[in-house]
């Protein structure tokens, strides 16, 4: 983590699915908005950059390994982050968890002083790591992640419990062990106990503010 002043601070938060990435990102966002003002900070979710699959049938889309780096368009994410750092606005794609592909809509995203990235595979790509001013890995036990994922995917994403468990056994856990967990070595900060770790939240907020003022 650099001590120099930044015109745009990019924070990357990685870790297993349902490890608390979104919660800690949203908490930091809400608390920094109160200090920096609206429009100064934004959150970008790696999930938005899942590849377009409109050319595939629904049966084929369901079989996609969404926990492998190839499922994500990191080229576009790197391009968008580079544009934002230069001061250019971008259009972030939107992804449908029920249709398993990109939606027609995009979300305009203007340059911000602070950008929080959150996603399972962010630290596996050296280009993304190079763009980050600080990187965090959420080190939450897999059994806790599975329980959270079951609740989330059934209640919020229209999944069945059986489909969630099959996906976990087939791709989620194996890909975590192959790609996500090894990427922990690239993190500047490893956060235990999930997204409600108050000490970690306060530390990250202080670090972000320090980087903004130099």
UniProtKB/Swiss-Prot annotation:
It is found in: Cytoplasm. It comes from the Bacteria. One of its GO terms (molecular function) is uridine kinase activity. Signal peptide: none annotated. SUPFAM superfamilies: P-loop containing nucleoside triphosphate hydrolases. It catalyses: uridine + ATP = UMP + ADP + H(+); cytidine + ATP = CMP + ADP + H(+). GO terms for biological process: CTP salvage; UMP salvage. Keywords: ATP-binding, Cytoplasm, Kinase, Nucleotide-binding, Transferase. One of its GO terms (cellular component) is cytoplasm. Pfam families: PRK. ATP binds at residues 15-22. Pathway: Pyrimidine metabolism; CTP biosynthesis via salvage pathway; CTP from cytidine: step 1/3; Pyrimidine metabolism; UMP biosynthesis via salvage pathway; UMP from uridine: step 1/1. It is an enzyme of class 2 (transferase). Its EC number is 2.7.1.48. Disulfide bonds: none annotated. InterPro entries: P-loop_NTPase (IPR027417), PRK/URK (IPR006083), Uridine_kinase (IPR026008), Uridine_kinase-like (IPR000764). Belongs to the uridine kinase family. HAMAP family: Uridine_kinase. This is Uridine kinase. It comes from Aeromonas salmonicida (strain A449).
């Amino acid at each position: 983590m650099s001590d120099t002043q930044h015109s745009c601070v990019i924070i990357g938060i990685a870790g297993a699915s349902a490890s608390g990435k979104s919660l800690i990102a949203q908490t930091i966002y809400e608390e920094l908005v109160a200090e920096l003002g609206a429009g100064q900070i934004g959150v970008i979710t790696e999930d938005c950059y899942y590849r377009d699959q409109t050319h595939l049938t629904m049966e084929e889309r369901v079989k996609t390994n969404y926990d492998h780096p190839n499922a994500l368009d990191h080229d576009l994410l790197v391009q968008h982050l580079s544009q934002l750092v230069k001061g250019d606005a971008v259009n972030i794609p939107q992804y449908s968890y029920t249709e398993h592909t990109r939606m027609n809509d995009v979300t305009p995203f203007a340059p911000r002083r602070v950008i929080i990235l959150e996603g399972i595979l962010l630290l596996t790509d050296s280009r993304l790591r190079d763009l980050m001013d600080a990187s965090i890995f959420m080190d939450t036990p897999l059994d806790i992640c599975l329980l959270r994922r079951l609740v989330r995917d059934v209640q919020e994403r229209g999944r069945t419990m059986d489909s969630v468990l099959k996906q976990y056994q087939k791709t989620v856990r194996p890909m975590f062990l192959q790609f996500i967990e090894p990427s922990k070595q690239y993190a500047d900060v490893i956060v235990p106990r999930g997204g409600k770790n108050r000490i970690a939240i306060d530390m990250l907020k202080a670090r972000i503010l320090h980087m903004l003022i130099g």
